[in-house]
Amino acid sequence: ATERVISEFLKLICGQDAVKILDAYRETIAVIIPEITVMFNFNQNNIHHSYDLWQHTLTALGTIEPNPILRMTMLLHDIGKPSVKTTDNSGQSHFQGHQLESKKIADRILHRLRLPSDFINKTLLLIEYHDVRFNGSKKLMKKVMNVLGTDLTKQLLEVEYADISAQSEYPVSYTHLTLPTKL
Protein backbone atom coordinates (compact mmCIF):
# COMPACT_ATOMS: atom_id res chain seq x y z
CA ALA A 1 0.00 0.00 0.00
CA THR A 2 2.82 2.43 0.82
CA GLU A 3 4.43 1.74 -2.55
CA ARG A 4 1.15 2.52 -4.33
CA VAL A 5 0.67 5.78 -2.41
CA ILE A 6 4.22 6.86 -3.17
CA SER A 7 3.88 5.91 -6.83
CA GLU A 8 0.81 8.14 -7.08
CA PHE A 9 2.50 10.90 -5.09
CA LEU A 10 5.47 10.93 -7.49
CA LYS A 11 3.03 11.19 -10.40
CA LEU A 12 1.32 14.07 -8.63
CA ILE A 13 4.50 16.08 -8.01
CA CYS A 14 5.51 15.57 -11.65
CA GLY A 15 2.08 16.47 -13.00
CA GLN A 16 1.16 19.60 -14.89
CA ASP A 17 -0.80 21.11 -11.97
CA ALA A 18 1.55 19.90 -9.22
CA VAL A 19 2.00 23.32 -7.62
CA LYS A 20 -1.74 24.07 -7.45
CA ILE A 21 -2.56 20.61 -6.09
CA LEU A 22 0.24 20.60 -3.51
CA ASP A 23 -0.86 24.01 -2.28
CA ALA A 24 -4.59 23.30 -2.24
CA TYR A 25 -4.15 19.93 -0.54
CA ARG A 26 -1.12 20.63 1.60
CA GLU A 27 -2.78 19.34 4.77
CA THR A 28 -3.62 16.09 2.98
CA ILE A 29 -0.06 15.82 1.64
CA ALA A 30 1.13 16.34 5.23
CA VAL A 31 -0.52 13.04 6.15
CA ILE A 32 2.08 11.36 3.91
CA ILE A 33 4.93 13.74 4.79
CA PRO A 34 4.08 15.42 8.12
CA GLU A 35 7.49 17.12 8.23
CA ILE A 36 6.39 19.61 5.53
CA THR A 37 4.06 21.43 7.93
CA VAL A 38 7.02 23.44 9.32
CA MET A 39 7.26 25.12 5.91
CA PHE A 40 3.64 26.34 5.87
CA ASN A 41 3.58 30.12 6.45
CA PHE A 42 7.23 30.10 7.60
CA ASN A 43 8.50 33.65 7.02
CA GLN A 44 12.08 33.54 5.75
CA ASN A 45 12.56 37.22 6.73
CA ASN A 46 15.47 37.79 4.36
CA ILE A 47 15.98 40.19 1.44
CA HIS A 48 16.66 37.25 -0.83
CA HIS A 49 13.26 35.67 -0.15
CA SER A 50 9.95 37.32 -1.00
CA TYR A 51 7.94 34.13 -0.40
CA ASP A 52 7.26 32.17 2.74
CA LEU A 53 9.11 28.84 2.77
CA TRP A 54 6.17 26.80 1.42
CA GLN A 55 5.51 29.19 -1.46
CA HIS A 56 9.22 29.33 -2.29
CA THR A 57 9.33 25.53 -2.29
CA LEU A 58 6.31 25.25 -4.58
CA THR A 59 7.58 27.95 -6.94
CA ALA A 60 10.95 26.20 -7.22
CA LEU A 61 9.26 22.83 -7.72
CA GLY A 62 7.11 24.24 -10.50
CA THR A 63 10.14 25.73 -12.23
CA ILE A 64 12.12 22.51 -12.61
CA GLU A 65 11.48 19.76 -15.16
CA PRO A 66 8.99 17.06 -14.09
CA ASN A 67 11.57 14.46 -13.13
CA PRO A 68 10.68 12.61 -9.87
CA ILE A 69 14.14 13.02 -8.33
CA LEU A 70 14.34 16.71 -9.21
CA ARG A 71 10.80 17.42 -8.01
CA MET A 72 11.35 15.55 -4.72
CA THR A 73 14.63 17.45 -4.30
CA MET A 74 12.81 20.75 -4.69
CA LEU A 75 10.06 19.68 -2.29
CA LEU A 76 12.57 18.87 0.45
CA HIS A 77 15.61 21.07 -0.30
CA ASP A 78 14.87 23.67 2.41
CA ILE A 79 12.85 21.60 4.88
CA GLY A 80 15.60 22.04 7.50
CA LYS A 81 15.52 25.85 7.47
CA PRO A 82 13.13 26.27 10.42
CA SER A 83 15.42 24.08 12.58
CA VAL A 84 18.53 26.20 11.99
CA LYS A 85 17.06 29.72 11.80
CA THR A 86 19.00 32.50 13.49
CA THR A 87 18.34 36.25 13.44
CA ASP A 88 21.06 38.89 13.24
CA ASN A 89 21.08 42.33 14.90
CA SER A 90 19.33 43.93 11.92
CA GLY A 91 16.45 41.45 12.12
CA GLN A 92 17.44 39.43 9.04
CA SER A 93 17.08 35.66 9.29
CA HIS A 94 19.88 33.29 8.33
CA PHE A 95 19.84 29.54 7.81
CA GLN A 96 23.44 28.37 8.04
CA GLY A 97 23.73 24.63 7.78
CA HIS A 98 20.22 24.19 6.41
CA GLN A 99 21.52 22.02 3.58
CA LEU A 100 22.74 19.29 5.93
CA GLU A 101 19.71 19.62 8.21
CA SER A 102 17.43 19.35 5.16
CA LYS A 103 19.38 16.31 3.98
CA LYS A 104 19.00 14.66 7.40
CA ILE A 105 15.23 15.24 7.47
CA ALA A 106 14.86 14.18 3.82
CA ASP A 107 16.81 10.99 4.53
CA ARG A 108 14.27 9.98 7.19
CA ILE A 109 11.34 10.86 4.92
CA LEU A 110 12.65 9.08 1.82
CA HIS A 111 13.52 5.91 3.74
CA ARG A 112 10.15 5.91 5.48
CA LEU A 113 8.50 6.20 2.05
CA ARG A 114 10.56 3.18 0.92
CA LEU A 115 11.91 4.83 -2.19
CA PRO A 116 14.67 3.01 -4.10
CA SER A 117 18.24 3.49 -2.83
CA ASP A 118 19.41 5.16 -6.04
CA PHE A 119 16.51 7.65 -5.85
CA ILE A 120 17.31 8.40 -2.20
CA ASN A 121 21.05 8.79 -2.77
CA LYS A 122 20.67 11.16 -5.72
CA THR A 123 18.02 13.25 -3.98
CA LEU A 124 20.11 13.57 -0.82
CA LEU A 125 23.21 14.61 -2.76
CA LEU A 126 21.25 17.26 -4.66
CA ILE A 127 19.82 18.60 -1.39
CA GLU A 128 23.24 18.65 0.27
CA TYR A 129 24.89 20.53 -2.60
CA HIS A 130 21.99 22.78 -3.67
CA ASP A 131 23.62 25.96 -2.34
CA VAL A 132 27.12 25.42 -3.76
CA ARG A 133 28.09 28.51 -5.74
CA PHE A 134 30.59 27.72 -8.49
CA ASN A 135 31.25 31.27 -9.71
CA GLY A 136 33.18 29.79 -12.64
CA SER A 137 35.64 28.00 -10.31
CA LYS A 138 37.23 25.04 -12.10
CA LYS A 139 38.59 23.68 -8.83
CA LEU A 140 35.21 23.68 -7.11
CA MET A 141 33.48 22.28 -10.19
CA LYS A 142 35.96 19.39 -10.36
CA LYS A 143 35.50 18.70 -6.65
CA VAL A 144 31.71 18.59 -6.98
CA MET A 145 31.86 16.54 -10.18
CA ASN A 146 34.11 14.00 -8.44
CA VAL A 147 31.40 13.50 -5.83
CA LEU A 148 28.29 13.78 -8.00
CA GLY A 149 29.43 12.74 -11.46
CA THR A 150 28.67 14.64 -14.65
CA ASP A 151 24.95 13.87 -14.96
CA LEU A 152 24.08 14.67 -11.35
CA THR A 153 26.17 17.86 -11.52
CA LYS A 154 24.08 18.98 -14.50
CA GLN A 155 20.95 18.24 -12.47
CA LEU A 156 22.43 20.19 -9.57
CA LEU A 157 22.68 23.26 -11.80
CA GLU A 158 18.99 22.82 -12.69
CA VAL A 159 18.16 22.61 -8.98
CA GLU A 160 20.17 25.75 -8.22
CA TYR A 161 18.53 27.67 -11.06
CA ALA A 162 15.03 26.66 -9.90
CA ASP A 163 15.90 27.57 -6.31
CA ILE A 164 17.31 30.99 -7.18
CA SER A 165 14.52 31.84 -9.61
CA ALA A 166 12.00 31.23 -6.80
CA GLN A 167 13.58 33.64 -4.32
CA SER A 168 12.92 37.36 -4.78
CA GLU A 169 13.29 40.35 -7.04
CA TYR A 170 16.46 41.33 -5.16
CA PRO A 171 19.19 41.71 -7.80
CA VAL A 172 20.84 38.37 -8.38
CA SER A 173 23.35 37.15 -10.89
CA TYR A 174 23.14 33.68 -12.35
CA THR A 175 26.81 33.77 -13.35
CA HIS A 176 27.74 31.50 -10.45
CA LEU A 177 25.77 28.75 -12.20
CA THR A 178 28.02 28.92 -15.24
CA LEU A 179 30.31 26.01 -15.81
CA PRO A 180 33.97 26.73 -16.47
CA THR A 181 34.73 26.54 -20.19
CA LYS A 182 37.47 23.95 -19.64
CA LEU A 183 38.02 21.62 -16.73
What are these regions (language model features)?
Residues 77, 98, 130, 176:
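Histidine-centered divalent metal-coordination motifs
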Residues 90-91, 96-98, 138, 144:
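Short leucine-rich amphipathic alpha-helices used at interfaces
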Residues 44-61, 115-171:
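Histidine/acidic-rich helix-loop-helix segments that form or flank divalent-metal centers
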Residues 1-75, 79-93, 101-115:
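Glycine- and charge-enriched loop/helix tracts that form the active or gating conduit
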Residues 81-85, 167, 182:
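General alpha-helical segment detector with a strong preference for membrane-spanning helices
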Residues 175-181:
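Conserved small/polar residues in nucleotide/adenosyl-binding loops
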